[in-house]
Curated annotation (Swiss-Prot):
InterPro entries: Ribosomal_bS20, Ribosomal_bS20_sf. It comes from Flavobacterium psychrophilum (strain ATCC 49511 / DSM 21280 / CIP 103535 / JIP02/86). GO terms for cellular component: cytosol; small ribosomal subunit. Keywords: Ribonucleoprotein, Ribosomal protein, RNA-binding, rRNA-binding. This is Small ribosomal subunit protein bS20.
Length: 83
């Protein structure tokens, strides 16, 4: 266990960030799954812009890598256009 006040604070702040990052990542994954099971093109197109925005936010906060974000956006866009 840490002995310094700053180390204790760092442990607390890291835990808060970890919980928030996990929530945001899980929410995005659920939105991606919902998009992939969509069968209607208009519904999927509406969901796509929301999902792409969520992916961009994760990449901006370094929760996921920029290249992974690009690959996900590309795959999802191709999926929606193929409907």
């Amino acid at each position: 266990m840490a002995n310094h006040k700053s180390a204790l604070k760092r442990i607390r702040s890291n835990e808060k960030k970890r919980v928030l990052n996990r929530y945001q990542h899980k929410t995005t994954r659920n939105a991606i799954k919902a998009l992939r099971i969509a069968t209607d093109k208009t519904e999927a197109t509406a969901k796509l812009s929301n999902v792409i925005s969520m992916i961009d936010k994760l990449a901006k906060k370094n929760i996921i890598h920029d290249n992974k974000a690009s690959n996900l956006k590309s795959k999802l866009t191709r999926f929606v256009s193929s409907l």
